[in-house]
Amino acid sequence: MEQHNLTTVNEFILTGITDIAELQAPLFALFLMIYVISVMGNLGMIVLTKLDSRLQTPMYFFLRHLAFMDLGYSTTVGPKMLVNFVVDKNIISYYFCATQLAFFLVFIGSELFILSAMSYDLYVAICNPLLYTVIMSRRVCQVLVAIPYLYCTFISLLVTIKIFTLSFCGYNVISHFYCDSLPLLPLLCSNTHEIELIILIFAAIDLISSLLIVLLSYLLILVAILRMNSAGRQKAFSTCGAHLTVVIVFYGTLLFMYVQPKSSHSFDTDKVASIFYTLVIPMLNPLIYSLRNKDVKYALRRTWNNLCNIFV
C-alpha cells in the first residue's frame, strides 16, 4: 500500500459515453448540435435580459443568472466531451480534471439556489404584489445571487482540494465522460470515508434546503391562487409555468440520481442522467422560457424586428 501511495498520477483516462465505434460519429453530431443550441440560447437570454428595457425586473435578473449557470456547467463539460469523440484515447490532465470538477460543482450547486431564489421571487410577486418592489429591491436580488456563488465556491474548493490532496493508486481510468467527485473516489488509495461524508452532507443540505424553499413557495402561491378569480388564476399560472417546468425537470433528474436504491445505482445510469442535466437541460431552459413567457417572446420579436430594420 505504501508503494501505491507513492504512485504519481499525471493524467486520467475518461471512459466516455460509449466505446461502440459505430456510435461515435452520430453521438458527436447530436451532442454538438445540442451544445451549440445551448450556448446560443443561453447567451441570447443573457444579452436579451441585459439590454431589453422591459426585462429589467427581478424575475429576469434571476433568469439571466440561471442562463449563466446553464452556460457555465455545459461549457465546463461539453467541449471536452466532444473532443473525446474524435480522439483515440480520452485523456484529461490531472490539473484540468481538478479544474473541471471545481467549476462544475460551483455552477451546478449555484443553479439549485438560483431556482430557489426565483421561486421566492414568484411568491412575492403573486402573494405580495403591492410590496413587490420594496421586498425584491436591487440589493436583495444581488444578495440572493451572491450568497449561492460564494457558498458554492467554498464547497467546490473544499471538495476538490480534499480529493486531489489524497493519494491515487496509479489506476487512472474514470468511469465517466467528465471529472466528477463520485467516479474519482474509487481511484483513491487513501481512506475516502471523510470525503464521502462531506459530499453526502453538503449534497443533502443543498438539495433538501433548496427544494424546501421551492416547495414552500409554491404551496403559498397555490393557496393565493385558489383565492383569485379566473382571470387572476390564469395570469398567475402563466407567470409560474416556465419556472415550474424547469424546476420539475432539473430536480427530477437530480433526485433520480441520488435517491435511487444503492442496488440499482451504477455509473452507466449516472452517465445517462448526467448527459441530461449537463447538456439537455441547459438547452431546454432558454427554450422553455422563450415559449412559455410572453415578455421574453415579445422581447425576442422586438429584437428581431430591430435587427431586420438595421440590415434590410
From Swiss-Prot:
<keyword id="KW-0297">G-protein coupled receptor</keyword>
<feature type="glycosylation site" description="N-linked (GlcNAc...) asparagine">
    <location>
        <position position="5"/>
    </location>
</feature>
<keyword id="KW-1015">Disulfide bond</keyword>
<dbReference type="InterPro" id="IPR000276">
    <property type="entry name" value="GPCR_Rhodpsn"/>
</dbReference>
<keyword id="KW-0552">Olfaction</keyword>
<feature type="topological domain" description="Cytoplasmic">
    <location>
        <begin position="121"/>
        <end position="139"/>
    </location>
</feature>
<keyword id="KW-0716">Sensory transduction</keyword>
<feature type="disulfide bond">
    <location>
        <begin position="97"/>
        <end position="189"/>
    </location>
</feature>
<keyword id="KW-0472">Membrane</keyword>
<feature type="topological domain" description="Cytoplasmic">
    <location>
        <begin position="292"/>
        <end position="312"/>
    </location>
</feature>
<protein>
    <recommendedName>
        <fullName>Olfactory receptor 8K3</fullName>
    </recommendedName>
</protein>
<dbReference type="GO" id="GO:0004984">
    <property type="term" value="F:olfactory receptor activity"/>
</dbReference>
<keyword id="KW-0812">Transmembrane</keyword>
<feature type="transmembrane region" description="Helical; Name=6">
    <location>
        <begin position="237"/>
        <end position="257"/>
    </location>
</feature>
<feature type="topological domain" description="Extracellular">
    <location>
        <begin position="161"/>
        <end position="197"/>
    </location>
</feature>
<feature type="topological domain" description="Cytoplasmic">
    <location>
        <begin position="218"/>
        <end position="236"/>
    </location>
</feature>
<keyword id="KW-1133">Transmembrane helix</keyword>
<dbReference type="InterPro" id="IPR000725">
    <property type="entry name" value="Olfact_rcpt"/>
</dbReference>
<feature type="transmembrane region" description="Helical; Name=4">
    <location>
        <begin position="140"/>
        <end position="160"/>
    </location>
</feature>
<dbReference type="GO" id="GO:0005886">
    <property type="term" value="C:plasma membrane"/>
</dbReference>
<keyword id="KW-0807">Transducer</keyword>
<feature type="transmembrane region" description="Helical; Name=2">
    <location>
        <begin position="55"/>
        <end position="75"/>
    </location>
</feature>
<feature type="topological domain" description="Extracellular">
    <location>
        <begin position="76"/>
        <end position="99"/>
    </location>
</feature>
<feature type="topological domain" description="Extracellular">
    <location>
        <begin position="1"/>
        <end position="25"/>
    </location>
</feature>
<comment type="similarity">
    <text>Belongs to the G-protein coupled receptor 1 family.</text>
</comment>
<feature type="topological domain" description="Extracellular">
    <location>
        <begin position="258"/>
        <end position="270"/>
    </location>
</feature>
<feature type="transmembrane region" description="Helical; Name=5">
    <location>
        <begin position="198"/>
        <end position="217"/>
    </location>
</feature>
<keyword id="KW-0675">Receptor</keyword>
<dbReference type="GO" id="GO:0004930">
    <property type="term" value="F:G protein-coupled receptor activity"/>
</dbReference>
<feature type="transmembrane region" description="Helical; Name=1">
    <location>
        <begin position="26"/>
        <end position="46"/>
    </location>
</feature>
<feature type="transmembrane region" description="Helical; Name=7">
    <location>
        <begin position="271"/>
        <end position="291"/>
    </location>
</feature>
<feature type="topological domain" description="Cytoplasmic">
    <location>
        <begin position="47"/>
        <end position="54"/>
    </location>
</feature>
<dbReference type="Pfam" id="PF13853">
    <property type="entry name" value="7tm_4"/>
</dbReference>
<keyword id="KW-1003">Cell membrane</keyword>
<dbReference type="InterPro" id="IPR017452">
    <property type="entry name" value="GPCR_Rhodpsn_7TM"/>
</dbReference>
<comment type="function">
    <text>Odorant receptor.</text>
</comment>
<keyword id="KW-0325">Glycoprotein</keyword>
<feature type="transmembrane region" description="Helical; Name=3">
    <location>
        <begin position="100"/>
        <end position="120"/>
    </location>
</feature>
